[in-house]
């Protein structure tokens, strides 16, 4: 899926090093994520193995937004197990310099297309209650707030509330 400035592609094992580096960058840009500038603490081989499995999966997917081969954003769906297998967790991130360019919408549309093709019934996500830009994006695609989870994060001694949101694909 190509756009004027960026393309949306499914993550592959060869994206692992660039993806780990990307996660360090975005972790240092905001406090909206579950990690900081340390990124996710995975070895390169573990990330490659994870992406290799995910690239063939119909239960999980990770898309990348790229500009000239550089990762500027990512979005993923991860299916729950057993009694919750009709539900998937949705996550999305974008380098701050690319906020507002349409990449988050393009990633979300790719995710929704994958979800519908694979008969997922519910998408769930967690978002900082004060991240109005992200909340607006989710609401644009039909996500609804279920509740607020007080003190979901604790950063530098400050409690951060999160909203739990859901999109039903059955309606």
Q: What residues fall within each predicted segment?
A:
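Conserved catalytic-core motifs of GNAT/GCN5-like acyltransferases
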Residues: 124-127, 139, 144-160
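Conserved G/P- and acidic residue-centered "switch" motifs that form tight phosphate/ATP-binding loops
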Residues: 69, 102, 131
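Conserved GNAT acetyl-CoA-binding A-motif
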Residues: 115-126
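Terminal substrate-recognition subdomain of acyl/acetyltransferases
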Residues: 2, 159-171
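Conserved acetyl-CoA-binding loop-helix of GNAT-fold acetyltransferases
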Residues: 100-113, 117, 136-140
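Short glycine/proline-centered loop/turn elements that form peptide/ligand docking sites
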Residues: 108, 131-134, 151-156
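Hydrophobic pocket/interface hotspot
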Residues: 19
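Acetyl-CoA-dependent GNAT
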Residues: 10-13, 24-27, 37-97, 108-109, ...
């Amino acid at each position: 899926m190509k756009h004027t400035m960026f393309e949306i592609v499914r993550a592959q094992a060869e994206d692992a090093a660039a993806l780990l580096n990307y996660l360090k960058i975005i972790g240092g840009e905001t406090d909206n994520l579950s990690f900081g500038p340390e990124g996710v603490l995975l070895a390169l081989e573990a990330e490659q193995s994870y992406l290799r499995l995910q690239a063939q999966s119909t239960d999980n997917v990770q898309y990348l937004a790229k500009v000239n081969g550089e990762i500027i954003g990512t979005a993923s769906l991860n299916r729950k197990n057993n009694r919750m297998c009709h539900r998937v967790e949705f996550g999305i991130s974008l380098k701050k310099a690319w906020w507002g360019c349409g990449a988050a919408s393009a990633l979300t549309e790719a995710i929704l297309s994958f979800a519908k093709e694979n008969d997922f019934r519910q998408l769930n996500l967690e978002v900082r209650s004060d991240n109005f830009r992200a909340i607006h994006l989710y609401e644009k695609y039909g996500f609804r707030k279920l509740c607020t989870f007080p003190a979901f994060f604790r950063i530098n001694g400050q409690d951060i509330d999160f909203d739990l949101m859901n999109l039903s694909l059955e309606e």
